[in-house]
């Protein structure tokens, strides 16, 4: 994979511009490839880089890496740190974690408070982590135009020219009679009207009218300005965020801060602030954009074969047309499909008409109610130290293949309800078991009894592979007590 740090831009960096990457979503409409603990932004959908890596590369053209803020949750933070490890030093203090999702307004308010404290003139460039954008220069120009308006205390959003009567996006109508600013072909206008996701008839009318734009979900504003507007239109949220800031500044326990955040009422920045503000402005932009909101969205950005099919992975097809076939690992064979979606992963397969791709969220909701593990994570789960793959599980046992990269070290931990048996397949493992520390070579094994502190690390130059067999009445990943951890995860006080 090409080094992300090599990406450069001729755009002059604004010393007061702080990109804020919103990376707390679950991407349910992209299941089964996207899972709650490994969502869409962590996937390689187009090219060699994941969506969040592409987003990071894009925004550092306008601002120094140490001014990029990441808004996410504890469950995803470690995976994001791994994917953005080239900037681990610059980003080390720039993760703002939501203990629980409360929609976009609380998350943005929390980051805005932090940035206003760091820099009274801070301008936020708020971007989702999982969008695809083509046209770096056009994006840079739009950011520069929006930042000019933000300095006048406007709350700026980017408008996307519709290419079809889409019912999955909100729409924005600018007041073209008033031009707030102009740079080249770009113009900024006050927002005349926000429209929630319309039905098909209304969407067709907006497309025909030609003066409505898709709401991109990207924003530029001064941190102080958005805090003022939140205070004006969402006073309860403003008071709650101020209270959380005070708790954090006074050294309150994490539990107290988390409880205060969970008490906030969920509210969207669009409906809660932008649609009510008199300072809302729009800059219609010229870059190619897709939020990859469903499998059907791949039609917009992915290359197609002569029959209009999007084919990814090991796929053999006979006579299909305008279909999307995604093979994660296994061979996928299709015959005579028309306008269909087929997505195969090691533990789940999706088959649906393209016209119903938005309904995948309903499937995920059913899986959540059933407490099915397939909505939560893949069989292979990535960690900062490497990964593990579930090979088999049943009542009272689970078998994993654990991979530890050179220099990787798991936390010092114990489990209350399971024991473990480790067999080294390749490499040499440094094992901590209770008071013992010893090396375990290829072909050798050891037992980790219940309630015993233990740790696994790889001091060698090659990747360490072990087979782990767990036994016990409960084998969930939450049965863990950490005492030491190299990656900043929760440890027992």
Spans of model-derived segments:
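Conserved core of the sugar-phosphate nucleotidyltransferase
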Residues: 135-263, 281
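Catalytic metal- and UDP-sugar-binding loop of GT-A-like glycosyltransferases, i.e.
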Residues: 22, 127, 424, 469
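Intrinsically disordered, low-complexity, mixed-charge
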Residues: 457, 471, 484-489
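Noncatalytic nucleic-acid binding interfaces
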Residues: 466
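Left-handed beta-helix
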Residues: 2-16, 223-423, 428-446, 454, ...
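Residue-level signal for inorganic ion chemistry
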Residues: 52, 111, 130, 172, ...
């Amino acid at each position: 994979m090409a080094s992300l740090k090599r990406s450069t831009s001729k755009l002059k960096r604004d010393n007061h511009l702080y990109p804020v990457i919103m990376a707390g979503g679950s991407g349910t409409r992209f299941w089964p490839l996207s899972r709650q603990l490994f969502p869409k932004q962590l996937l390689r959908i187009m090219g060699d880089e994941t969506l969040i890596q592409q987003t990071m590369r894009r925004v550092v053209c306008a601002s120094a890496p140490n001014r990029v803020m990441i808004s996410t949750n504890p469950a995803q933070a470690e995976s994001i740190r791994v994917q953005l490890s080239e900037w681990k030093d610059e980003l080390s203090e720039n993760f703002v974690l939501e203990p629980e999702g409360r929609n976009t307004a609380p998350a943005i308010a929390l980051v805005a408070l932090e940035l206003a404290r760091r820099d009274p003139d801070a301008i936020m460039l708020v971007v989702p982590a999982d969008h695809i954008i083509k046209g770096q220069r056009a994006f840079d120009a739009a950011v520069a135009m929006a930042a000019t308006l933000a300095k006048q205390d406007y709350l700026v959003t980017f408008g996307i020219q519709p290419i079809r009567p889409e019912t999955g996006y909100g729409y924005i109508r600018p007041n073209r009679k008033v031009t707030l600013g102009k740079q080249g072909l770009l113009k900024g206008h006050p927002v005349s009207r926000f429209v929630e996701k319309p039905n098909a008839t209304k969407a067709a009318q907006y497309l025909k009218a030609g003066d409505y734009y898709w709401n991109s979900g990207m924003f530029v504003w001064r941190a102080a300005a958005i805090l003022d507007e939140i205070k004006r239109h969402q006073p309860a949220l403003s008071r709650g965020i101020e209270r959380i800031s005070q708790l954090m500044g006074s050294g309150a326990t994490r539990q107290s801060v988390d409880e205060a955040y969970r008490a906030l009422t969920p509210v969207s920045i669009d409906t809660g602030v932008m649609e009510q503000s008199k300072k809302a402005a729009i800059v219609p932009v010229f870059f190619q954009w897709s939020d990859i909101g469903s499998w059907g969205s791949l039609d917009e950005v992915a290359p197609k074969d002569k029959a209009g099919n999007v084919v990814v992975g090991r796929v053999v097809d006979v006579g299909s047309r305008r279909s999307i076939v995604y093979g994660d690992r296994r061979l996928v064979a299709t015959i005579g499909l028309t306008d269909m979606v087929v997505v195969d992963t090691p533990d789940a397969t999706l088959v649906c008409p393209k016209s119903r791709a938005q309904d995948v969220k309903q499937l995920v909701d059913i899986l959540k109610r059933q407490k099915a593990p397939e909505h939560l994570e893949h069989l292979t789960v990535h960690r900062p130290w490497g990964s593990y793959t579930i090979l088999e599980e049943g009542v009272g046992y689970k078998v994993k293949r654990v991979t530890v990269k050179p220099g990787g070290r798991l936390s010092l931990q114990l489990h209350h309800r399971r024991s473990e048996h480790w067999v080294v397949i390749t490499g040499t493992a440094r094992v901590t078991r209770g008071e013992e520390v010893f090396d375990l070579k290829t072909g050798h094994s050891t037992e980790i009894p219940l309630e015993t502190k233990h740790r696994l690390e790889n001091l060698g130059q090659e990747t360490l592979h072990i087979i782990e067999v767990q036994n016990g009445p409960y084998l969930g990943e939450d049965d863990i007590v950490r005492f030491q951890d190299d990656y900043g995860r929760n440890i027992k006080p």
